Amino acid sequence: DYDGVLLTPAARQIALVSDDGDEVRLRVDAGVEWDDLVEWAVQRGLWGIENLSLIPGKAGAAPVQNIGAYGCEAKDAIRRVEMYCVETGTVLTLDAAHCGFGYRESVFKHDLKGRVIITAVEIALSHTPRPRLGYGDVEREVEARGGATLRNIREAICSIRRAKLPDPAVLGNAGSFFKNPVVEASVAENLLKAYPD
């Protein structure tokens, strides 16, 4: 049980900030479902977040955890984060360079935790194809679908994720959230010998 106030962002718009012919900047309200944003981008031929398909949660949560999957992280696309400062009642914008992004880390999990409410995220996507297929089974799954199109990459990622986790609509689960462990080389080698698959 949680003894406190829980705020859920209600704003769910995706707005064009700029398009220079290659880079497309979008302002995404915090309440947009992350996977809906990925599908929206794929439908419009915009590259950059397709490997983050099927990650549950809202766009406003993406910078907090610096969500990532299959060789891509939210920080790769995020340019700015808009937030409401609880202490001052003002709206602030933080450039990505000041978000303290690291492996599943950000300033929002530490210095700004409990002090701000993320209201929107500005991301940069591209019209230029930039497939990232070098992680695990992604390349094989994409090739089986006919090659590296945005749609094929999204479908491959979704297929891989569905094979690993039950559908939360059928069997409630917390999804996949973890940090890869950092161990000594000898420990990793022993694990690979014991579990080659």
Regions found by a protein language model. Name each.
Residues 1-88:
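Anion-binding (especially nucleotide phosphate/pyrophosphate-binding) glycine-rich loop
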Residues 91-197:
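Phosphate/pyrophosphate- and phosphate-bearing ligand-binding catalytic cores of soluble enzymes
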